[in-house]
Swiss-Prot record:
One of its GO terms (biological process) is killing of cells of another organism. One of its GO terms (cellular component) is host cell plasma membrane. Keywords: Cytolysis, Host cell inner membrane, Host cell lysis by virus, Host cell membrane, Host membrane, Membrane, Transmembrane, Transmembrane helix, Viral release from host cell. Coiled coil: none annotated. This is Putative antiholin. Involved in lysis inhibition. Interacts with and inhibits the holin thereby delaying the host cell lysis timing. Interacts with holin; this interaction this interaction blocks the holin homomultimerization and delays the host cell lysis. InterPro entries: LysA-like (IPR047759). It comes from Escherichia phage P2. The chain crosses the membrane at residues 4-24, 32-52, 94-114. It is found in: Host cell inner membrane. The gene is lysA.
């Protein structure tokens, strides 16, 4: 319950700051949104790297049979194999777009572009690792 309330408070404060930064592009709320974007960028880069390494480790060591007691398996399942409801995906897309628009409107263009590229890259990494773990090879162009 405590984790849920903390997550709810963070999401509400982010939504409020996003709304304020879209209404007032030169306000302090933009700094909060920029700090959020930089933090999210770092998290996506680290999670993507750790996830890819753990996926390769799990596939090399265990193959397709995933023992639940391994730390690498827990990392892989929490990052890549948990189903994401469509409402959460839609909300995440709205947050990414609103963050991008807010940062561009305030003049943080480089930060906005890096945030957008890294978040899309993390989604691609997640999809490719999920396909590898399910036994399908990603599309090869």
């Amino acid at each position: 319950m405590k984790k849920l309330s903390l997550s709810l408070m963070l999401n509400v404060s982010l939504a409020l700051m996003l709304a304020l930064s879209l209404i007032y592009p030169q306000s302090v709320a933009v700094n909060f949104v920029a700090a959020w974007a930089i933090l999210a960028t770092v998290i996506c880069v680290v999670a993507g790297g750790v996830g890819v390494y753990a996926t390769e480790y799990v596939l090399e060591r265990y193959g397709r049979e995933l023992p639940p007691e391994s730390l690498a398996v827990k990392i892989v399942t929490s990052l890549f194999l948990q189903p994401v409801p469509w409402r959460r995906r839609a909300a995440a897309l709205v947050v990414v777009v609103a963050t991008f628009i807010s940062l561009v409107a305030a003049g943080w263009i480089f930060t906005a572009l890096i945030y957008l590229v890294v978040s899309l890259f993390f989604r691609l990494i997640r999809k490719a690792c999920r396909q590898r773990l399910e036994g399908r090879e990603p599309c090869q162009g």
